[in-house]
């Protein structure tokens, strides 16, 4: 109910990591939810499904199946190495597609999930000191966070049953200005340096599959080491 909702005013320039850390400081629950303001619910029981996984002892971060406004897949887990950093699994696939080895329709583990819709225990959040607001203000903070949580000995889960629309970048716009592009490149470089080994060999993704496209296709001979 609205009586249980508290609206906080963040008194500083946009910094996705800092804003979410600020919100968590005021939260009282044992499970934290990061939900972007451009998210729209499709599955009525989405939260029940995601909390069911988040409260398991073996689970760290839990992400959802996110769709573009035209119902194409926007997010069905995160694969390390796409674009040199990380990208969304099965991006632009039809909503009805099962995906590679049913990984769109089946709940399964990924190294990371997007924080556009992410649940995690408060204890895990505190254990890794939240999101990195100094080095990752906008991009890749969720990937960095998921990998830190994974380091606690738990698995990050993509919850296929929870479907939501993600009207991506409607509120902020795209990072197309020179300043935003420079910031993105700095954050990409930080991720590549901090998680070099994981990006080179994502344990949730086959080394025989390409990192050139987000579609789980087999590597071309020119991509083989």
Cite the ranges covered by each PLM segment.
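C-terminal, non-catalytic tails of nucleotide-sugar-dependent glycosyltransferases
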Residues: 70, 82-110, 119, 156, ...
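Short aromatic/hydrophobic "clamp" motif used to bind/position activated sugar donors
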Residues: 32
């Amino acid at each position: 109910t609205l009586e249980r909702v508290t609206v906080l005013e963040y008194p500083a320039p946009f910094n996705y990591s800092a804003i979410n850390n600020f919100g968590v400081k005021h939260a009282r629950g044992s499970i934290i939810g990061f939900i972007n303001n451009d998210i729209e619910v499709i599955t009525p029981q989405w939260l029940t499904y995601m909390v069911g996984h988040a409260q398991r002892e073996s689970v760290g971060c839990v992400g959802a199946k996110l769709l573009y406004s035209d119902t194409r897949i926007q997010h069905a887990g995160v694969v390390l190495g796409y674009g040199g950093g990380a990208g969304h699994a099965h991006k632009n696939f039809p909503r009805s597609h099962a995906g590679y080895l049913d990984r769109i329709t089946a709940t399964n583990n990924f190294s990371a999930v997007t924080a556009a819709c992410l649940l995690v225990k408060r204890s895990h959040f505190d254990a890794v000191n939240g999101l990195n607001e100094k080095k990752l203000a906008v991009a890749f903070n969720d990937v960095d966070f998921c990998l830190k949580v994974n380091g606690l000995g738990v698995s990050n889960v993509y919850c296929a049953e929870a479907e939501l629309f993600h009207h991506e970048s409607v509120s902020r716009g795209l990072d197309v200005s020179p300043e935003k592009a420079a910031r993105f490149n700095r954050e990409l470089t930080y991720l590549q340096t901090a998680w070099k080994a994981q990006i080179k060999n994502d344990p949730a993704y086959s080394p025989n599959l390409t990192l050139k496209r987000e579609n789980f296709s087999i590597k071309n001979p020119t991509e083989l080491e």
